[in-house]
């Protein structure tokens, strides 16, 4: 089947412009394929958004694409090369178990990578087997869709297939492949790789390609590389604020896990915070708390500093001048983050305008929440509904004092109560992909029962809907002596 007929049948409008880059950035390779694949999950709503033929892709024809048994006609799959600072240590990486099948261009000219994750070993695999297990792939499916529902930029999952073979992790698990959709997979680590092992022309080619793809409005500007750095800094500031505002903890914010597009990517050891504590860590390998909830803004800044270092030769031919430009741009991150953070927190408290003491009001609430171990999500739900259950935070003197200050601040706004409530409801999710709910969904799914997962996914499409039907997803996990721990399974 040629590309035209394939496009007509599937809806995929395929290209691979990444192949126009110098060949140090990729390695051509076909997926290994699956002997006995089974379609486990197909994202109908995403397929519809992308203009794909849901019926065809939800059949055996689509299964063979998602299982790596069929590639796109005329398009060469590639594994992408990149480096990464893993917990601060620089190393060569690359797609060790993923292949970019191609780029789908929608009718409104939006371009998306179509990537298979878990499709077999590549030239960059190092010691890994190139495969993925079912539970981690389903976990990424659930959480990425949850993030999308929350309005947070993210890669998404089009399909998950089981491969019919077992993979050895701590135990034998069902093998799987996830089809990931992303604006692109160009990472901070891609630029670090180019700066370390490529030529100046290689670095320039990558920057020009990325600007044309993600920031076309600056492509013809004589200062485009400086503007490029500033645009990436701004997007990351916006993204991290959105993470923080819902208690999302990525868990492994290495430079290879920060993409230039400003999407959330690589959901390995991520989790959502229940009890508000800025020191919260879930990842089994984050012993020192480098990527703790409260440290995520600093780690984003650290990553962006590494990005600016990679761009130095493009910022100015004079190294000292380039360093000064980079420092000036990087210094804006904290200002942008602070601005976006307090703006977001105002909306969570129903405030439409900015006042001098708002920062103290916001910090006062958060410090009280931390002191009394309040649930992050449900505290803001309680404020939104103005209904307070028998939680120790709400009966504390600190909260009562804070509440009076907040009510006075709301009076200064002089807005109708309905407007305030709507603003809060649109910014305080009623539900999130709570860790215990995700684990229950995965536990059942591994046994072949997808009922709970399907219901959870449906609920997560509308997390800001304060519906009685969603109340069961607001319940906290049972108290346990064993802390919740996540692993880099994805």
Curated annotation (Swiss-Prot):
Protein family (similarity comment): Belongs to the SELO family.
Cofactor(s) the record lists: Mg(2+); Mn(2+)
Protein's organism: Clostridium perfringens (strain 13 / Type A)
Gene symbol of the encoding locus: ydiU
Binding residues for ATP: 94, 96-97, 117, 129-130, 180, 187, 266
Protein name: Protein nucleotidyltransferase YdiU
Pfam families in UniProt: SelO (PF02696)
Consequence of substituting residue 149 to S: In strain: 8-6
Binding site residues for Mg(2+): 257, 266
């Amino acid at each position: 089947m040629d590309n035209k007929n394939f496009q007509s049948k599937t809806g995929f409008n395929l290209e691979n412009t990444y192949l126009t880059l110098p060949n140090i950035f990729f390695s051509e390779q076909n997926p290994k394929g699956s002997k006995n694949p089974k379609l486990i999950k197909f994202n109908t709503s995403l397929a519809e958004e992308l203009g794909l033929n849901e019926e065809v892709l939800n059949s055996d024809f689509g299964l063979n694409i998602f299982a790596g048994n069929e590639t796109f006609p005329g398009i060469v799959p590639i594994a992408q090369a990149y480096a990464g600072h893993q917990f601060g240590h620089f190393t060569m990486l690359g797609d060790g178990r993923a292949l970019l099948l191609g780029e789908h261009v929608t009718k409104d000219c939006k371009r998306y990578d179509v990537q298979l994750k878990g499709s077999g070993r590549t030239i960059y695999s190092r010691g890994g087997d190139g495969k993925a297990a079912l539970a981690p792939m389903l976990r990424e499916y659930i959480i990425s869709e949850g993030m999308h529902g929350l309005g947070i930029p993210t890669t998404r999952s089009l399909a998950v297939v089981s491969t019919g073979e077992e993979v050895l992790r701590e135990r034998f698990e069902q093998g799987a492949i996830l089809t990931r959709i992303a604006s692109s997979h160009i990472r901070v680590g891609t630029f670090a790789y180019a700066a370390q092992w490529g030529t100046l022309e290689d670095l320039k080619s990558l920057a020009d390609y990325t600007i044309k793809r993600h920031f076309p409005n600056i492509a013809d500007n004589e200062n485009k590389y400086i503007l490029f750095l500033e645009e990436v800094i701004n997007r990351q500031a916006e993204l991290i604020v959105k993470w923080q505002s819902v208690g999302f903890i990525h868990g492994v914010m290495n430079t290879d896990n920060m993409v230039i597009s400003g999407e959330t990517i690589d959901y390995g050891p991520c989790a959502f915070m229940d009890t508000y504590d800025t020191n919260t860590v879930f990842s089994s390998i984050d012993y020192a708390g480098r990527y703790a909830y409260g440290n995520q803004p600093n780690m984003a800044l650290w990553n962006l500093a590494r990005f600016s270092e990679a761009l130095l030769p493009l910022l100015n031919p004079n190294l000292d001048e380039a360093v000064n430009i980079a420092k000036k741009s990087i210094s804006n991150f904290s200002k942008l983050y602070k601005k976006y953070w307090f703006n977001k927190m105002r909306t969570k408290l129903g405030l439409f305008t900015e006042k001098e003491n708002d920062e103290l009001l916001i910090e006062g609430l958060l410090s009280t929440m931390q002191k009394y171990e309040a649930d992050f999500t449900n505290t803001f739900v309680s404020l939104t509904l103005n209904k307070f259950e028998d939680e120790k935070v709400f009966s504390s003197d600190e909260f009562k004092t804070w509440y009076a200050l907040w009510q006075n601040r709301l009076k200064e706004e002089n807005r109708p109560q309905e407007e305030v409530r709507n603003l809060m409801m649109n910014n305080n999710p009623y539900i999130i992909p709570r860790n215990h709910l995700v684990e229950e969904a995965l536990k059942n799914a591994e046994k072949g029962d997808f009922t709970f997962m399907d219901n959870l996914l449906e609920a997560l499409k509308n997390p800001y809907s304060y519906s009685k039907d969603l109340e069961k997803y607001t319940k906290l996990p049972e108290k346990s002596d064993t802390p919740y721990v996540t692993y880099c399974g994805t």
